[in-house]
C-alpha cells in the first residue's frame, strides 16, 4: 500500500507519485500502513483499468511549463525529492499534504516552503488537509500556500470552517531567466540526486476567461513600511 498523488486530466490518469519519506516519529506512524517509494520496484501500476507510470521521479510536461510532485514529509527531508525534480526541469512543485498543527509549526512550515522554492528557483504550491478533516488526535488548519522563488504569493485563511480556493500566477518565464543566470543551479545539475526523471507529456489549454490577479510593485527598490527602517 502506498500513499500517493494521482495526476488526472480529462478522465485519463497520467501518473501516480508515491510518497518517498514516511514519518514514523511523535504523532506519526505511517510506516505501519504504507510503503515508501524507495521500496517500490515497479515503475507502472494498473489503476481504474489503466496502466500508468508510477514513481517519485515523474515530470509532467506541458507546452507552457513542467511540474513535479512530492507529498507532505518529503519537504522535511534533508534532500527533498523536489530538489532532483527541479534540477531535471520542474518549474513548479505541488505538495499534497496532511500537515497537522502545533505551536510555532506554521511559521516553520512557511520557512521551509520559502527556502525550498528559493533553492529550487521554482514555484511551490502547498495544499494541506483542512475543513472537516481534523480528528481527536491531530488538528489541520487547511494551509494553502503558493510561493515563487522564496516569496509568498498567496495563502489561505487558517482554521476556516468552509472550503477555500486560492489562486495566483507563477511567473514561469522569470523562473527560467533566474535559472539561466544562476551558475550554481547549472553546476548542481551535474551532481543531481535521485533517479533520472521520467517525462510525461500532456496537453494544456489556457482558459480564455482567465483574469490575472497578481500585481507587481512599480518601485521594487524603494522600501515600504517596516522595511524602510531596516534598509535605510
Please name every model-derived segment.
Residues 1-232:
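Enzyme catalytic cores with a strong preference for nitrogen-chemistry domains
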Amino acid at each position: 500500500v502506498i500513499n500517493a498523488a494521482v495526476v488526472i486530466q480529462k478522465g485519463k490518469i497520467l501518473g501516480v507519485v508515491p510518497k518517498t519519506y514516511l514519518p514514523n516519529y511523535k504523532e506519526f506512524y505511517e510506516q505501519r500502513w504504507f510503503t515508501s517509494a524507495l521500496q517500490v520496484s515497479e515503475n507502472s501500476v494498473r489503476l481504474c483499468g489503466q496502466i500508468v507510470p508510477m514513481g517519485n521521479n515523474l515530470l509532467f510536461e506541458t507546452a507552457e511549463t513542467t511540474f513535479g510532485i512530492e507529498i507532505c514529509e518529503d519537504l522535511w527531508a534533508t534532500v527533498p525529492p523536489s530538489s532532483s525534480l527541479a534540477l531535471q526541469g520542474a518549474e513548479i512543485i505541488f505538495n499534497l499534504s496532511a500537515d497537522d498543527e502545533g505551536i510555532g509549526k506554521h511559521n516553520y512550515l512557511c520557512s521551509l516552503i520559502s527556502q525550498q522554492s528559493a533553492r529550487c528557483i521554482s514555484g511551490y504550491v502547498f495544499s494541506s488537509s483542512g475543513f472537516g478533516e481534523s480528528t481527536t488526535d491531530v488538528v489541520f488548519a487547511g494551509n494553502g500556500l503558493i510561493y515563487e522563488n522564496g516569496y509568498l504569493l498567496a495563502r489561505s485563511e487558517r482554521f476556516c470552517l468552509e472550503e477555500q480556493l486560492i489562486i495566483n500566477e507563477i511567473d514561469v518565464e522569470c523562473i527560467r531567466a533566474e535559472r539561466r543566470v544562476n551558475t550554481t543551479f547549472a553546476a548542481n545539475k551535474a551532481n543531481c540526486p535521485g533517479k533520472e526523471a521520467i517525462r510525461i507529456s500532456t496537453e494544456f489549454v489556457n482558459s480564455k476567461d482567465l483574469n490575472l490577479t497578481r500585481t507587481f510593485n512599480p518601485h521594487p527598490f524603494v522600501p515600504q513600511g517596516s522595511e524602510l527602517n531596516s534598509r535605510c
